[in-house]
Amino acid sequence: MPIVEIHTDQYRVPLETPLSDSTHGEMSDFGLVVVRLVDERGQIGVGYTYTVNNIGTGAIWKIIDSDLVPLLQGADPGAIDTLWKKMWWRLHFVGRGGMASFAMAAVDIALWDLRGQRESLPLWRLLGGDSAEVPAYAGGIDLDLSTQGLCAQAEGFLDQGFHAIKMKVGRARLSEDVERVSAMRELLGPDFPLMADANMRWSTDQAIAAADALEKFDLFWLEEPIVPEDLAGHARLGRETRVPIATGENLHSVHEFEHLMTYGHVDFPEPDAATLGGITPWIEVAKIAQDRGLPVTSHGIHDIHVHLLAGVPNASYLEVHGFGLERFLKQRLQLKEGKAIAPDSPGHGVALDLDGLRPFRQATGSSHD
């Protein structure tokens, strides 16, 4: 049953409330690229990727529409590994990461969704999982909030049933971060899992100083203290600090993750299927981590990642933060007693409200066999 139709759409979606972190500054909107693959039976696989502040979204859509659609037209959608390698090598001269990996991700997620439709299995079962439940944490994008506002947000997360929370760090002065983390620890209690995310704000020396200052608050992990490509810096963090390190959301290939785990240091590898190239490389990163005795976590698109974490044996926490996309989902992620529950419908079960998104569409493409 070959692919007979391919539809691609690009959107620029305003956020209801602007967000802020130490790297991107204020974020007022996000970009979304959606791919729909249709086979001869009329079954549809949906995939998507996203950007911050809509930067690069048009280029990602163009890569898919101009360079990947011709490769996919008439192809066997069940040959996911083969198609992934063909996409990689088709784009490698201008890609090997970056926007090429974003483009591949939207296609690869659609292929896996279509496989689930064809086999009448939810993605988490297709991957070999035996439980749909995954521990989840609330990912706050809250660097601009006052300490009072930060704690009020945390109380809202507790009311929603979360049993773990992540906050942002990376303020202008380390003393501000210490004060804010201290307030959160006092609010949440000594045993509540609390993560902190610096969004690559620091140099290695600054990160070591921050880890030392924050160690007494027993963070579950310190996320992205430095840029992820700095292998020597991560090796130093592993040797010279005692706070667990999570990183990887800004790595765009399996090779980069393997190098980080081999030559650098990470306690919680953090691949993002929407930016890494899709589900196929995400699973490979999880296997590499498992071979090293490391748990894997996630970043963004929690409606996809809940399946992936439920499908691997070395899952840690699922980050829950939809970046505004949840407004356009017909069914939102289900939470129960601090755990996210992957849908039991075939594929990934993400049903986008395309009518609701239509006012924000900036480009569209369609190809028929």
Predicted regions and their residues:
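Metal- or metallocofactor-binding catalytic centers and their adjacent structured scaffolds
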Residues: 5, 38-118
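Hydrophobic faces of well-ordered beta-strands that scaffold small-molecule active sites
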Residues: 47, 136-139, 165-167, 194-198, ...
